């Protein structure tokens, strides 16, 4: 793993070729190895700096936290906090990350004018937390990369003060693909007809304006580890 900024690998050793070694977690040709337990804190700090630098103009921040992804390496100050191993500690550290971003938005009085979405790109791996009696996917069948619900039904939390009703819920089935149309709608940008034709604007649903027809006619998922795919329409799912 390496740091990448503006499409460039950071910390390259002068004159050396970068090569993968071992189990692909380490590279040759890097001058300074990254401190794995500081990855989360570093990313959170850079996200805060980005907000500081753009506080006076509209901005889009995509923050793909690596906290609860392997390798599970929570910061030293989080070790043992959860009483549920590295996974639980990492979940708590992620919660701190989100709180830090919220605090930064409030610091610049941007919390009223910012659409914040927290979600995941896949379901959890169920082995994490199992020894502590915890089921990462709750009652859902399957796990990450599975065609079943545990593979792709994930939490989706959105906040836009004054626009999204507090404590509201929706039963609509949506996809991460819908972020494109939703972000453009929130920014007041018209999405060209040929761009992301399978992306749907979720803002009306999020704001409590119920639609006469579903947001999506159907949702298609493909399993990474098998040839299976599923088509979900309303309460029905064909595999």
Segments from the language model and where they lie:
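Beta-strand elements within well-structured catalytic alpha/beta cores of enzymes
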Residues: 58-64, 91-94, 98, 115-120, ...
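Loop/turn elements at helix/coil->beta-strand transitions in domains of secreted/extracellular proteins
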Residues: 55-61, 110-116, 152-154, 214-217, ...
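Metal-dependent active-site segment of extracytoplasmic phospho-/sulfohydrolases and closely related
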Residues: 93-132
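The substrate-binding groove and active-site-proximal loops of carbohydrate-active enzymes
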Residues: 29-41, 80-93
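Core domains of carbohydrate- and sulfate-ester-processing enzymes
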Residues: 1-29, 127-154, 236-239
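Active-site His/acidic residue clusters
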Residues: 7-8, 47-89, 125-130
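Short glycine/proline-rich turn/loop motifs
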Residues: 22-32, 76-81, 159-164
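C-terminal cap/loop subdomain of S1 sulfatases and analogous C-terminal strand-loop tails that border
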Residues: 124-147, 164-168, 172, 177-239
């Amino acid at each position: 793993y390496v740091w990448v900024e503006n499409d460039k690998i950071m910390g390259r050793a002068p004159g050396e070729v970068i090569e993968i070694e071992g189990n692909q977690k380490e590279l040759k040709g890097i001058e300074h190895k990254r401190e794995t337990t500081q990855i989360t804190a570093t990313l959170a700090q850079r996200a805060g700096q980005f907000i500081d630098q753009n506080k006076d103009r509209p901005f889009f921040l995509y923050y793909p936290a690596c906290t609860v992804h392997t390798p599970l390496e929570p910061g030293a100050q989080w070790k043992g906090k959860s009483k549920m191993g590295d996974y639980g500690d990492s979940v708590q550290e992620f919660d701190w990350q989100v709180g830090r971003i919220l605090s930064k938005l409030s610091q610049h009085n941007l919390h009223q004018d910012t659409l914040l979405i927290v979600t995941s790109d896949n379901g959890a791996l169920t082995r994490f937390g199992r020894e502590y009696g915890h089921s990462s996917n709750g009652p859902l069948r399957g796990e990450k990369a599975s065609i079943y619900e545990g593979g792709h039904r994930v939490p989706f939390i959105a906040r836009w003060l004054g626009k999204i009703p507090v404590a509201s819920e929706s039963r609509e089935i949506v996809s991460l693909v819908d972020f494109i149309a939703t972000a453009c709608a929130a920014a007041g940008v018209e999405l060209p007809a040929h761009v992301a034709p399978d992306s749907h604007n979720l803002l009306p649903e999020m704001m409590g304006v119920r639609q006469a027809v579903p947001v999506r006619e159907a949702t298609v998922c493909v399993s990474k580890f098998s040839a299976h795919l599923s088509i979900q329409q309303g309460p029905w799912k064909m595999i």
